[in-house]
Amino acid sequence: MAGHDIKYGKHRTRRSFSRIKEVIGLPNLIEVQTLSYKNFLDEGLANVFKEMFPIDNFAGTMELEFVGYEMKTPKYTVEEARAHDANYSAPIYVTFRLVNKETGELKTQEVFFGDFPLMTEMGTFINNGSERLIVSQLVRSPGSYFHLKTDKNGLESFGHTTIPNRGAWFELDTDAKGIGYVRIDRTRKLTFTTMLRALGFGSDDEILELLGETQLLTDTIAKDVHKNPADTRVEEALKDIYDRLRPGEPKTADSSRGLLVARFFDPKRYDFAPVGRYKFNKKLALKNRLLGLTLAEPIVDPETGEILVNTDTLVTRDVLDLIEPLLDNGLGNFVVEPSDDAVIPEPITLQSIKVYSPKDSERVVTLLSNGNPDSECRVLTPADVISNISYWLGLAEGIGKVDDIDHLGNRRIRSVGELLQNQVRIGLSRMERVIRERMSSSENENITPQGLINIRPVTASIKEFFGSSQLSQFMDQHNPLSELSHKRRFSALGPGGISRDRASYEVRDVHYTHYGRMCPIETPEGPNIGLINNLSSYAKVNEYGFIMSPYRRVDRVNGIVTDEVEYLTADEEDNYTVAQANSPLTDDSRFANETVMARHTGNNIEVEASTADYMDVSPKQVIAVAAACIPFLENDDSNRALMGANMQRQAVPLIDPHAPWIGTGMEHQTARDSGAALLAKHAGVVEYVDGNEIRVRRTSGELDIYNITKYRRSNSGTSYNQRPLARLGEKVEKNDIIADGPSMENGEMALGQNPLVAYMTWEGYNFEDAVIMSERLIKDDVYTSIAIEEYESETRDTKLGPEEITREIPNVGDEALKNLDESGIIRIGAEVKDGDLLVGKVTPKGETDPTPEERLLRAIFGEKAREVRDTSLRVPHGGGGIVHDVRVFTRENGDELPSGVNKLVRVFIAQKRKIHVGDKMAGRHGNKGVVSNIVPVEDMPYLPDGTPIDIMLNPLGVPSRMNIGQVMELHLGMAARTLGIHIATPVFDGASDEDIWDTVKEAGMAADAKTVLYDGRTGEPFDNRISVGVMYMIKLHHMVDDKLHARSVGPYSLVTQQPLGGKAQFGGQRFGEMEVWALEAYGAANVLQEILTYKSDDVIGRTRAYEAIVKGERIPKPGLPESFRVLVKELQSLGLDMKVFDADRNVLDLRELDEDEVMTRPDNTEITPEMLEAQEAIVAQAEAEEEALINADIEK
């Protein structure tokens, strides 16, 4: 027997064909959301307050300090927030201290700071009763970047950009003449030496001494001449910079100093964030530039004075390991004193080392670094500017390397915690201005922290973020996998990201650093391709937001691959050689072969086993969770794998789902981490189980009660239903699944079913990927799902009085009211059809003032019945089903309703959707199709033992699509079902051809795994043997019930009077210009005229046509289309004199052609009001007769 058994959870064992030992399990799959939010609550929120406070008044006499904050218990639980359309949030109270510096008086006060959104255990937020989540964002990391540019003449030059988290950009560039320029915040450029002079290095000699002599530097100095002898070089430079930043304003050296400080050196205006400082120091550190260079000075141990490395030594990896600790401890540090009139006249600490230029071995180049400032330093420093210029000058000498912005070392994830932190910062900075103004304008004696603080900017900022940000999304709740995928998704779009229209091919493309960090498969098809991505299955995000991938460390001394796992970021991984996960190992964890396939900076190379530094932990670390659920993914073309991964997320939860016979081993953890299953919070013993709750007695003696969710409407309109899995008396551990969620079976994800599939054609019904299906799948409810739709009706106060929910509805018979209760609301369990009443509601009509006679009669006989109109809620087209739940919200019950609303009624209608022709089906390999025919079981082809086939697929769908995985799944699935075993075949480490044939043989199937099929209609065998097996097939959310639509009489557009379009508006089908051309080509003049008049926007004509049809008369000639009048009016509004003439050249007045003016019958006699009444009576009679006939049929 090939393979070995592995237990997944408590309820499923699978035979696994994996050969590679997995050293670590998958991490918690939603920790990217939960950890980020936890860090925000623990540290991030307090950090924002500490950044913003204390706040002083303008005079400096008062100060408002932040002391601390406390979150109180939430008003609603998660379930209550859902039911009440509320937010799941907790009130936050912040303690402030107001210090009066003149008197020393302290006032401490706790201030309510609004309700703060809380994350549920599943990583989502409840906002206005609906479940939303914050998608992480992939953005450029702040830092120092260098790039190579080629101009149109083919000349190469280097550029530099300093990107902060917040603040002005600083750029360096070279022109065609070889002069270097600096550009501050995208303004006009000026020579880069001007910036150095402004920092306090006024003379040419000082600059040359600092940076060393290079061609670019000497050429630029020659261009940068002293223009105004009245100013020092430093002052002149400062004024030049001011002139670029504020052209036209009077300039002084002092104002320029203030401006430069505000742009780059002021923490309020400029912020690198810790990640920016980390990236900056890493880029500019000398140790990262020295490898491969020759030293032009000896390296001396500062403590002993011993020469460790001599001059003219080539820096190898070993030499670098020797001098790296010394560089980190300040070797080569020196201090320069800028002139007194510099921007910041303080000593500047730099670090230097001299090397020979790779382009000219005689020339010495001085490399400068910024002295590695502390991570607390979050502004640009003069040392940073000088080091940047030094690095940039060095690039022309072949020292240092340019950056690739698409490298994942230069792009980082902004998760929910950081995004929320930014919103709070925006709110607080708006609040800061208000506080300062109030401090300065108020009387000092009576002022309190509460009086200074207005929390509206903060609450508005958070509310706006959750309500309308591009990154705050309505959660995809089709099934557990779509939930999980949505939580692990990250987007390059959104505020601060890139725009869809300007995204280049490079940004969207797969990059070598995506390996083990970002899935190369799972991304949308269409305009967002490559901009929205998913986290790979083992990936984690570090404190700076960089994605890390795990690797097993190789002990190179002993040649052993250890079980010690290290998480590396993309730029750390570039320094190492990483062996593939499928490299064969001996029993004592050594490489079995002399050489191994490995990766180094994006190259796949064969290296000696002794040179590998790390080894992949698992073959599936490359791809995301959805792709890892596709068996035999390695045998599918990548385009089809992308479709397969994306379509699994569209699977509809079925009423009786089954886990796949052929899985990948990912099904259990995906189901557990998705949030759809019910997990035990503590270990214990199950004391009680029923359909609604499970009680678990903890080992400590306490009782945990778990409520099971039954048939709740999900965000996608599907049924969210949990079923108990735990049994009475069963022992459960923490995080065990005790109830299956939707699309789950026995603790595993179960998106579809395992039908018997044959690859064969049948009467052409599976042409173009169509699917032929057996009637058994309908009779046995194999692919039946439940759709739940929500309808609501509210009563408001109108000018004429309040609306009412009631049974007393004008002109509605008892038959229509039979399912309403005494208050006029439908009863739960009632079966309703299109147009049936759900909530009876009446609205007051406008009444004219009564005449004196009427007033007299009312006084004698009492008040007559009020005039009301029927505004009841009815079942829309295609919405019929069974009333599953009714919820009534009123203020008396303590529900929060919008102003003007007195009562809100919500009705949920459930529909049982059996599969039928037009529904979309798919396998897991991107093989999708539409059900084209449902064949009686007796007509389906059958196996020699009489078993009829369930589904027939077109064999031509396989070769051109190159998704051979489906064929392998088919054969192995048949063997698995025959043997009664579930199988796990992990991606890139699954069943080989030999394993499949061995299992087929074990199951006693034919050697070619094919079979003879017999035609169910004739009993004759088909000519050739046919591939038959078990394949996992899912029903997708694109159901024909949601799409099929036909209009009878419906609404019209106000302006053009043409029917609306679309199913939601009960609209018609557009007869567009191409269709008109077709009729014109056939000369079908009458049909064309009808379509352009009666059936479109001839208002009078359609009324007359209706009347003529009802009376059985000839249909009259059409009138003037409304859109023609609109066109005339539009032309007149442009000042063009448009007149309309009849056939005899008489001018027609369009107003006279209005319905009110002339309304004639076909014989040109005028229509009177009496005639219209008679017409209405005829119509009413015809409708009554029709209803009577229908009722008679029903009785029959």
From Swiss-Prot:
Any GO BP annotation: DNA-templated transcription
NCBIfam families cross-referenced by the UniProt entry: PRK00405.1, rpoB
Family: Belongs to the RNA polymerase beta chain family.
Pfam families from the UniProt entry: RNA_pol_Rpb2_1, RNA_pol_Rpb2_2, RNA_pol_Rpb2_3, RNA_pol_Rpb2_45, RNA_pol_Rpb2_6, RNA_pol_Rpb2_7
The protein's name in its UniProt record: DNA-directed RNA polymerase subunit beta
Superkingdom classification of source: Bacteria
Catalyzed chemical reaction(s): RNA(n) + a ribonucleoside 5'-triphosphate = RNA(n+1) + diphosphate
Source organism (scientific name): Lactococcus lactis subsp. cremoris (strain SK11)
This protein's UniProt keywords: DNA-directed RNA polymerase, Nucleotidyltransferase, Transcription, Transferase
Function: DNA-dependent RNA polymerase catalyzes the transcription of DNA into RNA using the four ribonucleoside triphosphates as substrates.
Coiled coil regions, renumbered to chain: none
PROSITE patterns, A to Z: RNA_POL_BETA
GO MF annotations in UniProt: DNA binding; DNA-directed RNA polymerase activity; ribonucleoside binding
Quaternary structure and partners: The RNAP catalytic core consists of 2 alpha, 1 beta, 1 beta' and 1 omega subunit. When a sigma factor is associated with the core the holoenzyme is formed, which can initiate transcription.
GO cellular component term of the entry, any: DNA-directed RNA polymerase complex
Name of the top EC class for this enzyme: transferase
EC number(s) per entry: 2.7.7.6
